[in-house]
């Protein structure tokens, strides 16, 4: 099984393997097999469209966790210029599960903040698998207050299973750090745009998710608990995760229908990991458009609009 493809993608992986095999045979024997390769490529595209046009909520949840999916730093590299990372919460330490700093979007200074999971084992451990401790959220808060002070818009990228639930995090008051961020973000006198790029897990996501405009990538999720966690509570077994995912309404389209999400950003065929540069271009286009729209509001209008948006949830 190809580790770059999930189990429901394996028919696509098999076709891709055949295409690569034919290319190697053609190169070795100087054979003209272009027509056959083109036929298989068309078949692969059709198959991909068919599979991804009928994904279940559970399959989308697994796509949101795909090991090759672009992370915050990947998007920063492809969307922004002159990124200068800032470190530390000025209270305890620097949490690598949250990255942030000043950058430029369309030559305008912005503050970019996001979760970072890590690719290889050592980096995953260093970044705690994208699960921030209190110092991560306090770092994010410090950067957001700096952005307000210097009149910079704030752009956040959400991708976390949730806030870290370890003893050390609780000792440093994880819940207070999250709650304080919610309070601060609700009052910041600068535009805030949040984009869910992978997993939007519970309070760990909300802590950088209070905003004027909320986007979700097509194959991302946003929920109060993971499908496995929900299934374990309701059915006492994580094997019911597919049922839980469907019942919870965790996908971008479902949340858009509920009025929680403002914009669902399309992904390249097969997911953002198939073409990270194209995925970044789609996000950049949306961020530029939304930022131009939000700049039309003065501070009072911005805060009133944000308050009304938050109060509309559940109505």
From Swiss-Prot:
Protein's UniProt keywords contain Zinc: no
Q: Spell out the InterPro entries in the cross-references.
A: Acetyl_CoA_COase_a_su (IPR001095), ClpP/crotonase-like_dom_sf (IPR029045), COA_CT_C (IPR011763)
CC annotations in GO: acetyl-CoA carboxylase complex
Its subcellular locations are: Cytoplasm
Enzyme type, top EC level: transferase
UniProt pathway annotation: Lipid metabolism; malonyl-CoA biosynthesis; malonyl-CoA from acetyl-CoA: step 1/1
GO annotations under biological process?
A: fatty acid biosynthetic process; malonyl-CoA biosynthetic process
What Gene3D superfamilies does the record tag this protein with? 2-enoyl-CoA Hydratase, Chain A, domain 1
Kindly state which keywords UniProt assigns to this record, in alphabetical order: ATP-binding, Cytoplasm, Fatty acid biosynthesis, Fatty acid metabolism, Lipid biosynthesis, Lipid metabolism, Nucleotide-binding, Transferase
Q: What is its EC number?
A: 2.1.3.15
Q: Tell whether Lipid metabolism is among the UniProt keywords.
A: yes
Which residues are in the CoA carboxyltransferase C-terminal domain?
40-293
Q: Which GO terms describe its molecular function?
A: acetyl-CoA carboxylase activity; ATP binding; carboxyl- or carbamoyltransferase activity
Catalyzed reaction equations:
N(6)-carboxybiotinyl-L-lysyl-[protein] + acetyl-CoA = N(6)-biotinyl-L-lysyl-[protein] + malonyl-CoA
For this UniProt entry, what is the primary localization, expressed as one broad class?
cytoplasm
Q: Which Pfam families match?
A: ACCA
Q: Which family is this sequence assigned to?
A: Belongs to the AccA family.
User: How does it associate, per the subunit comment?
Assistant: Acetyl-CoA carboxylase is a heterohexamer composed of biotin carboxyl carrier protein (AccB), biotin carboxylase (AccC) and two subunits each of ACCase subunit alpha (AccA) and ACCase subunit beta (AccD).
Function summary? Component of the acetyl coenzyme A carboxylase (ACC) complex. First, biotin carboxylase catalyzes the carboxylation of biotin on its carrier protein (BCCP) and then the CO(2) group is transferred by the carboxyltransferase to acetyl-CoA to form malonyl-CoA.
Protein name per its UniProtKB record: Acetyl-coenzyme A carboxylase carboxyl transferase subunit alpha
Q: What is the native source organism of this protein?
A: Pseudomonas syringae pv. syringae (strain B728a)
UniProt gene name: accA
């Amino acid at each position: 099984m190809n580790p770059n493809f999930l189990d429901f993608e394996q028919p696509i992986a098999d076709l891709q393997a055949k295409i690569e095999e034919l290319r190697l045979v053609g190169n070795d024997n100087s054979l003209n097999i272009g027509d056959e390769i083109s036929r298989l490529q068309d078949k692969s595209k059709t198959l991909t469209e068919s599979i991804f046009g009928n994904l279940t909520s559970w399959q989308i949840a697994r796509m949101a966790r795909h090991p090759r999916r672009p992370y915050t730093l990947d998007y920063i590299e492809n969307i922004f210029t002159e990124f200068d990372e800032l470190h530390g919460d000025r209270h305890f330490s620097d949490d690598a599960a949250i990255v942030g700093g000043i950058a430029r979007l369309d030559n305008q200074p912005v503050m970019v903040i996001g979760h970072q999971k890590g690719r290889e084992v050592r980096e995953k451990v260093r970044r705690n698998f994208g699960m921030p401790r209190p110092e991560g959220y306090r770092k994010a808060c410090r950067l957001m207050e700096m952005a307000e002070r210097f009149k910079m818009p704030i752009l956040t990228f959400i991708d976390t299973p949730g806030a870290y639930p370890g003893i050390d995090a609780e000792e440093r008051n994880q819940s207070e750090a999250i709650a304080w961020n919610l309070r601060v973000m609700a009052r910041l006198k600068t535009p805030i745009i949040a984009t869910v790029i992978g997993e939007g897990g519970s309070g760990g996501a909300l802590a950088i998710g209070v905003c004027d405009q909320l986007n979700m990538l097509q194959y991302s999720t946003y929920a109060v608990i993971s499908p496995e966690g929900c299934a374990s509570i309701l059915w006492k077994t994580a094997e019911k995760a597919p049922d839980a995912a469907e019942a919870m309404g965790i996908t971008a389209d479902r949340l858009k229908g509920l009025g929680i999400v403002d914009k669902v950003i399309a992904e390249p065929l097969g997911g953002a990991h198939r073409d990270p540069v194209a995925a970044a271009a789609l996000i950049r286009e949306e961020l530029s458009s939304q930022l131009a729209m939000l700049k039309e509001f003065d501070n009072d209008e911005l805060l009133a609009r944000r308050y009304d948006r938050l109060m509309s949830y559940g109505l």
